[in-house]
Amino acid sequence: METSQGWLVACVLTMTLVWTVAEDVCRAPNGKDGAPGNPGRPGRPGLKGERGEPGAAGIRTGIRGFKGDPGESGPPGKPGNVGLPGPSGPLGDSGPQGLKGVKGNPGNIRDQPRPAFSAIRQNPMTLGNVVIFDKVLTNQESPYQNHTGRFICAVPGFYYFNFQVISKWDLCLFIKSSSGGQPRDSLSFSNTNNKGLFQVLAGGTVLQLRRGDEVWIEKDPAKGRIYQGTEADSIFSGFLIFPSA
């Protein structure tokens, strides 16, 4: 046991002595810096860095490139507003003649318009130069106005008018008409009476009238004296011959 302890002490002393000797042997003064070495070889590429912030817009614009290929068609758009009507196209060629129609039903004369009137002078009022026939004898469908002396057309067509007026003096009368408020050509009839006897001045005509046209009798202011009494009557008449197609 004592031998082992002695051996351990000897080893410790030996190691202490060696460390002390080595420290004294390796210590030397500091040397000067050596010359720079040659550049080393490039290292391996590093890892990819993080994405940087967007840069500012460039000042210059690049040259315009070539036209690209057409893109794919997009979805159909919404219908637009209806446009204005276009101008009428040219008249086309006449079509072939159609087939003959079916024969219609027979007409009923009772359903046809039949305007007609007759009026005489009895106690007429004075209305300028218009000759008033105030007493109505016939006024089918009421075309004649006895307070104005005018016939007003309600059924377009061809009409016959006539008058017979009694006088003991020179007399000049006119059959006058208007259309759309505008006067038309008038027809004049005159009679000279030198003996102061009853004479009849008569006249008549056929007129084509439109709705609203008017017909009446006028007198010449200088030769318009008409007999008025119970011995003879003056009359004004008119009726539709046939309506316009």
Curated annotation (Swiss-Prot):
Presence of keyword Glycoprotein: yes
Subunit structure as annotated in this protein's UniProt entry: Core component of the complement C1 complex, a calcium-dependent complex composed of 1 molecule of the C1Q subcomplex, 2 molecules of C1R and 2 molecules of C1S. The C1Q subcomplex is composed 18 subunits: 3 chains of C1QA, C1QB, and C1QC trimerize to form 6 collagen-like triple helices connected to six globular ligand-recognition modules (C1q domain). Interacts with CR1 (via Sushi 24 and Sushi 25 domains). Interacts (via C-terminus) with CD33; this interaction activates CD33 inhibitory motifs.
Sites where a glycan is attached: 48, 67, 100, 146
Comment field on protein domains: The C1q domain is the ligand-recognition domain, which specifically recognizes and binds the Fc regions of IgG or IgM immunoglobulins.
Chain ranges of the Collagen-like domain: 31-109
Highest taxon of the lineage: Eukaryota
UniProt keyword tRNA-binding present: no
Region (Disordered) location: 28-114
Gene responsible for this protein: C1qa
Post-translational modification: O-linked glycans are assumed to be the Glc-Gal disaccharides typically found as secondary modifications of hydroxylated lysines in collagen-like domains.
Composition-biased stretches (Low complexity): 79-99
Cross-referenced Pfam families: C1q, Collagen
Gene Ontology process terms (BP): astrocyte activation; complement activation, classical pathway; complement-mediated synapse pruning; innate immune response; microglial cell activation; neuron remodeling; synapse organization; synapse pruning
Residues that bear 5-hydroxylysine: 48, 67, 100
Activation and inhibition: The C1Q subcomplex is inhibited by sulfated molecules, such as triterpenoid sulfates, heparan sulfate, or chondroitin sulfates.
Transmembrane feature ranges: none
Organism encoding this protein: Mus musculus
Protein's name in the database: Complement C1q subcomponent subunit A
4-hydroxyproline PTM positions: 39, 45, 54, 79, 85
Domain C1q: 110-245
Signal peptide: 1-22
Compartment annotation: Secreted; Cell surface
Binding site residues for Ca(2+): 199
Record's keyword terms, sorted: Calcium, Collagen, Complement pathway, Disulfide bond, Glycoprotein, Hydroxylation, Immunity, Innate immunity, Metal-binding, Repeat, Secreted, Signal
General function of this protein: Core component of the complement C1 complex, a multiprotein complex that initiates the classical pathway of the complement system, a cascade of proteins that leads to phagocytosis and breakdown of pathogens and signaling that strengthens the adaptive immune system.
